């Protein structure tokens, strides 16, 4: 045995520290490596560049409503492939895949509860479910939310994140635009506030119906909001669109929305606005609220 081989036989390789999958993630905008639990505590907002990442419907509603007050509505409603639609894949297979991936039956989750002790009904889109597309179940759940708000005589808040009407349901999905808008007319007749929160992205038939019908239309920073996408518009008009076209900041400059609110400030802002509209005492910004306990950051960051 040569002297090199003798040295090699005495070398014990160090064991690489194992980090469970999913502990770290990267910001979609700046590429910063982020601790997953800290990002969740910060409501999926990058602490470095303030990029607002997409948030699941349930996490959004749980971050909005008071702990212990949440009651889900319309969970028994499930989509059906009435048309036996098929493109590159059967619609029923797309539904099964989306339901397995997200754990949701469809793209809208509705809950009633309290916000700073004020009764409200809130709805949020699950964009991971077929791009948050609006089908008959989404329309039915939204109408259920309106009916509950009317019954409880309380405000309604909807967080939109959708690519538009669901093409696999054809005319039935387009009918939801009129159905949801007609339901909101009853809120207006009763004088109950409806606040629409536009998140990234809010497009197509959703933006052309209830997403833009709020008594107050609020957007998150840099959210893409419009009907057709920028690429489609450029190809149609054969012109270069201005920078930031269809983003929140562009829309507020043109008067299309009322305000832009950062996600960490959204809960208190909504409570303050609704308290004024409902002639109730202003919420206490220092009121304690139970939150998640975040485990300590691991010593070793993942390799780039």
From Swiss-Prot:
Q: Domain named CoA carboxyltransferase N-terminal: which ranges?
A: 23-292
- Where the protein is mainly located, per its record? cytoplasm
State the pathway, as annotated in the record: Lipid metabolism; malonyl-CoA biosynthesis; malonyl-CoA from acetyl-CoA: step 1/1
Q: List the GO biological process terms.
A: fatty acid biosynthetic process; malonyl-CoA biosynthetic process
Q: Where is the composition biased (Pro residues)?
A: 295-304
Spell out the reaction equation it catalyses: N(6)-carboxybiotinyl-L-lysyl-[protein] + acetyl-CoA = N(6)-biotinyl-L-lysyl-[protein] + malonyl-CoA
Look at the named UniProt entry and state the broad enzyme category this protein falls under: transferase
Residue ranges for the region (Disordered) are 281-304
- Where located? Cytoplasm
Q: Name what cofactor the protein needs.
A: Zn(2+)
- Quick one: a GO cellular component term? acetate CoA-transferase complex
Question: Does the keyword section mention Glycosyltransferase?
Answer: no
- Molecular-function GO terms, alphabetical: acetyl-CoA carboxylase activity; ATP binding; carboxyl- or carbamoyltransferase activity; zinc ion binding
Subunit structure, interactors included: Acetyl-CoA carboxylase is a heterohexamer composed of biotin carboxyl carrier protein (AccB), biotin carboxylase (AccC) and two subunits each of ACCase subunit alpha (AccA) and ACCase subunit beta (AccD).
Q: Which family does it belong to?
A: Belongs to the AccD/PCCB family.
The UniProt entry, under HAMAP family, shows: AcetylCoA_CT_beta (MF_01395)
Alphabetical list of PANTHER family matching this protein: ACETYL-COENZYME A CARBOXYLASE CARBOXYL TRANSFERASE SUBUNIT BETA, CHLOROPLASTIC
Protein name listed in UniProt:
Acetyl-coenzyme A carboxylase carboxyl transferase subunit beta
Q: Which organism is it from?
A: Citrobacter koseri (strain ATCC BAA-895 / CDC 4225-83 / SGSC4696)
- What's the gene? accD
């Amino acid at each position: 045995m040569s002297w090199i081989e003798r040295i090699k036989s005495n070398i014990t390789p160090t064991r690489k520290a194992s980090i469970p999958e999913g502990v770290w993630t990267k910001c979609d905008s700046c590429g910063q490596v982020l601790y997953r639990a800290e990002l969740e505590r910060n409501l999926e907002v990058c602490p470095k560049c303030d990029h607002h990442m997409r948030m699941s419907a349930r996490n959004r509603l749980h971050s909005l409503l008071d702990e212990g007050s949440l009651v889900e509505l319309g969970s028994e409603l499930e989509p059906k492939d009435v048309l036996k639609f098929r493109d590159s894949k059967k619609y029923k297979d797309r539904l099964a895949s989306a339901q397995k991936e997200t754990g949701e039956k469809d793209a809208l989750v509705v809950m009633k509860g309290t916000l700073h002790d004020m009764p409200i009904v809130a709805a949020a889109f699950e964009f991971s479910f077929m791009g948050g597309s609006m089908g008959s179940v989404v329309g039915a759940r939204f109408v259920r939310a309106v009916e509950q708000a009317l019954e409880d005589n309380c405000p309604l808040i909807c967080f939109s994140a959708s690519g538009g009407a669901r093409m696999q349901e054809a005319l039935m999905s387009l009918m939801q635009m009129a159905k949801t808008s007609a339901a909101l007319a009853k809120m207006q007749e009763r004088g109950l506030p409806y606040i629409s929160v536009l998140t990234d992205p809010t497009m197509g038939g959703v933006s052309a119906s209830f997403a833009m019908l709020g008594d107050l239309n609020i957007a998150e920073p840099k959210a893409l909001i419009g009907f057709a996408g920028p690429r489609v518009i450029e190809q149609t008009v054969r012109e270069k669109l201005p920078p930031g076209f269809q983003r929140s900041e562009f829309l507020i400059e043109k008067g299309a929305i009322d305000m832009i609110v950062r996600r960490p400030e959204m809960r208190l802002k909504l409570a303050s606005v609704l308290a004024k509209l409902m002639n109730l005492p202003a919420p206490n910004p220092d009121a304690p609220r139970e939150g998640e306990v975040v485990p300590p950051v691991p010593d070793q960051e993942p390799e780039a």
